[in-house]
UniProtKB/Swiss-Prot annotation:
It is an enzyme of class 2 (transferase). The keyword Nucleotide-binding applies. One of its GO terms (cellular component) is nucleus. InterPro entries: UBQ-conjugat_E2_core, UBQ-conjugating_AS, UBQ-conjugating_enzyme/RWD. Disulfide bonds: none annotated. This is Ubiquitin-conjugating enzyme E2 D2. Pathway: Protein modification; protein ubiquitination. The active site is at 85 (glycyl thioester intermediate). GO terms for molecular function: ATP binding; ubiquitin conjugating enzyme activity; ubiquitin-protein transferase activity.
């Protein structure tokens, strides 16, 4: 079941790739993918190329995939291990969701962080109290780690 669904999503991604994103299997392991997200133009991550790993559980799509950044990023909802605080990867997961929709949701999280549900409270505080500083540090990290 999982493998069939993963193959279908791979074909759908090839046919209709989401804007600024790509994803596919690492070698022959269909349960382990690598994804790339281009930093959105209307964000301090503009120009960066961010790599992520995707691990599908054996009971996918009934359980969410594990998605994490491997490229370092300064963001209130993404920690230094690359873990992402995004409701659809946890409690709001639905089998109707696809990797394409997950990647687009992560893209919109880069444009619009959620400082009220932070994984890194200190970055959330800076985002809320000093947006210029947040944007500056985000741009610096993007240049340092994602270019």
């Amino acid at each position: 079941m999982a493998l069939k669904r993963i193959h279908k999503e791979l074909n759908d991604l090839a046919r209709d790739p989401p804007a600024q994103c790509s994803a596919g299997p690492v070698g022959d392991d269909m349960f382990h993918w690598q994804a790339t997200i281009m930093g959105p133009n209307d964000s301090p991550y503009q120009g960066g190329v961010f790599f992520l790993t995707i691990h599908f559980p054996t009971d996918y799509p009934f359980k969410p995939p594990k998605v994490a950044f491997t490229t370092r990023i300064y963001h209130p909802n993404i920690n230094s291990n690359g873990s992402i605080c995004l409701d659809i990867l946890r409690s709001q997961w639905s089998p109707a969701l696809t990797i394409s929709k997950v990647l687009l949701s992560i893209c919109s999280l880069l444009c619009d962080p959620n400082p009220d549900d932070p994984l890194v409270p200190e970055i959330a505080r800076i985002y809320k109290t000093d947006r210029d500083k947040y944007n500056r540090i985000s741009r610096e990290w993007t240049q340092k780690y994602a270019m």
